[in-house]
């Protein structure tokens, strides 16, 4: 059974999600204690936390906080997710990279096996296919472009503004590149690892600073965009209270981190603070066109889901067929060698006998293999289970 347990921006705001992470970790730990978890992949982004588990038995997970989907529904969700249909900004590309990273991490941690590998590889393939064959990701569709659009809605033109990017990771990079299209004055990048800040700043033709130099730089900054992976906040009312009152009232901060980087109390100083929740309401100028493209994407997902389901069903009998063929070939070869040893045959005749034994073996296995394939296609678990017992466990 494939199980997906998740919380995302569709059912919770950022604060609720932040508080729910530990609870989801606890549920996962309890499942590991009670059940034999065969495979696992974890996907964690700024606006979703998802766990995919492969379990060799039925399981009921009572929860009102999280979404729980199984088998076909879990597969369909992952394919939709990889395609950008489940994103806060429909069609954005960032989620596809995040799914690739989740798969790589699972490979590194040795928690992924053949089935989830097939599922995630298919999801990545579907995401790439949809972006290639539809226009769903065209027209400024990324969290980065959405963040910039939000700032423009709230602040007006970014022309001549000084921007501080805190965090040179994936999100910081996406937002920074969206800013390149605007006529900002200066983009300053701060990161705990200075080399990463310098690398991103070079791409932006901006300036890199060390993390502990931020206070000195804030006096020149109009817009702060923060997206670090820090477990605690890095900007608070106390930290920026030294700035002139007029400057604080003109300053806008956008917190794209989860858990949050910027404390809400900065608003008490007059700072305009926005977070990921506010991105939901960004005006989407291309929404109607992308909805049309989503219909095309849904058709691709439907076809690819059917192919994946059939492939997963056939995987159930792969070890049985492998064992059957290996054992049959082993016996055929043993008996052939005995016979050829007793008979004084020339090379041509030996080949004919070899061909004969192969033909007999293939014909004997033909109906068995076809029946197993039919059982897999019909999801006949009893037949497959019995075949495994007979051909695998008793050998």
Curated annotation (Swiss-Prot):
UniProtKB keywords: NADP, Oxidoreductase, Porphyrin biosynthesis
NCBIfam families on file: hemA
Xref: PANTHER family: GLUTAMYL-TRNA REDUCTASE
Residues annotated as the enzyme's active site: 46
SUPFAM superfamilies found in the cross-reference section: Glutamyl tRNA-reductase catalytic, N-terminal domain (SSF69742), Glutamyl tRNA-reductase dimerization domain (SSF69075), NAD(P)-binding Rossmann-fold domains (SSF51735)
UniProt GO MF annotations: glutamyl-tRNA reductase activity; NADP binding
Protein name: Glutamyl-tRNA reductase
InterPro entries, alphabetized: 4pyrrol_synth_GluRdtase, 4pyrrol_synth_GluRdtase_dimer, 4pyrrol_synth_GluRdtase_N, GluRdtase_CS, GluRdtase_dimer_dom_sf, GluRdtase_N_sf, NAD(P)-bd_dom_sf, Shikm_DH/Glu-tRNA_Rdtase
Miscellaneous comment as given in the Swiss-Prot or TrEMBL entry: During catalysis, the active site Cys acts as a nucleophile attacking the alpha-carbonyl group of tRNA-bound glutamate with the formation of a thioester intermediate between enzyme and glutamate, and the concomitant release of tRNA(Glu). The thioester intermediate is finally reduced by direct hydride transfer from NADPH, to form the product GSA.
Name of the top EC class for this enzyme: oxidoreductase
Site features described as Important for activity, chain residue numbers: 77
Binding residue positions for NADP(+): 167-172
Family the entry assigns: Belongs to the glutamyl-tRNA reductase family.
Pathway it works in: Porphyrin-containing compound metabolism; protoporphyrin-IX biosynthesis; 5-aminolevulinate from L-glutamyl-tRNA(Glu): step 1/2
EC number: 1.2.1.70
GO biological process, one term: protoporphyrinogen IX biosynthetic process from glutamate
Catalytic activity: (S)-4-amino-5-oxopentanoate + tRNA(Glu) + NADP(+) = L-glutamyl-tRNA(Glu) + NADPH + H(+)
Subunit structure: Homodimer.
Gene (name only): hemA
Free-text note on domains in this protein's UniProt record: Possesses an unusual extended V-shaped dimeric structure with each monomer consisting of three distinct domains arranged along a curved 'spinal' alpha-helix. The N-terminal catalytic domain specifically recognizes the glutamate moiety of the substrate. The second domain is the NADPH-binding domain, and the third C-terminal domain is responsible for dimerization.
Binding-site positions, substrate: 45-48, 87, 92-94, 98
Its biological purpose: Catalyzes the NADPH-dependent reduction of glutamyl-tRNA(Glu) to glutamate 1-semialdehyde (GSA).
């Amino acid at each position: 059974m494939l199980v997906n347990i998740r919380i995302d921006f569709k059912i919770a705001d950022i604060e609720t999600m932040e508080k729910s992470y530990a609870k989801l970790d606890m549920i996962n730990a309890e499942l590991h204690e009670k059940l034999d978890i065969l495979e696992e992949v974890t996907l964690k982004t700024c606006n979703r936390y998802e766990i995919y588990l492969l379990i060799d038995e039925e399981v009921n997970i009572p929860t009102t906080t999280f979404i729980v989907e199984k088998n076909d529904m879990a597969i369909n969700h992952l394919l939709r997710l990889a395609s950008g249909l489940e994103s806060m900004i429909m069609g954005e590309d960032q989620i596809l990279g995040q799914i690739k990273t989740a798969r790589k991490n699972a490979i590194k941690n040795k928690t992924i096996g053949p089935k989830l590998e097939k599922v995630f590889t298919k999801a990545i393939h579907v995401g790439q296919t949809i972006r290639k064959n539809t226009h769903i990701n065209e027209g400024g569709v990324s969290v980065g472009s959405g963040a910039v659009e939000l700032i423009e809605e709230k602040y007006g033109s970014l022309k001549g503004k000084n921007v501080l990017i805190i965090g040179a990771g994936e999100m910081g990079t996406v937002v920074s590149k969206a800013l390149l299209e605007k006529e900002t004055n200066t983009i300053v990048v701060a990161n705990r690892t200075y080399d990463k800040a310098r690398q991103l700043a070079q791409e932006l033709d901006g300036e890199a600073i060390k993390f502990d130099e931020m206070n000195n730089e804030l006096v020149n900054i109009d817009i702060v965009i923060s997206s670090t992976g820090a477990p605690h906040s890095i900007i608070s009312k106390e930290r920026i209270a030294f700035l002139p009152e007029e400057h604080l009232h003109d300053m806008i901060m956008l917190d794209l981190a989860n858990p949050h980087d910027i404390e809400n109390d900065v608003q008490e100083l007059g700072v305009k603070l926005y977070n990921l929740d506010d991105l939901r309401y960004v005006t989407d100028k291309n929404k109607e066109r992308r909805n049309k493209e989503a219909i095309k994407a849904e058709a691709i997902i439907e076809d690819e889901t059917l192919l994946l389901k059939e492939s997963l069903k056939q995987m159930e009998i792969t070890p049985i067929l492998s064992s059957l063929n290996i054992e049959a070939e082993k016996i055929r070869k043993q008996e052939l060698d005995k016979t050829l040893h007793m008979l004084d045959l020339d090379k041509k005749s030996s080949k004919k006998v070899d061909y004969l034994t192969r033909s007999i073996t293939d014909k004997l296995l033909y109906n068995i293999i076809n029946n197993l394939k039919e059982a897999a296609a019909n999801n006949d678990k009893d037949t497959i289970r019995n075949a495994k017992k007979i051909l695998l466990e008793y050998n």
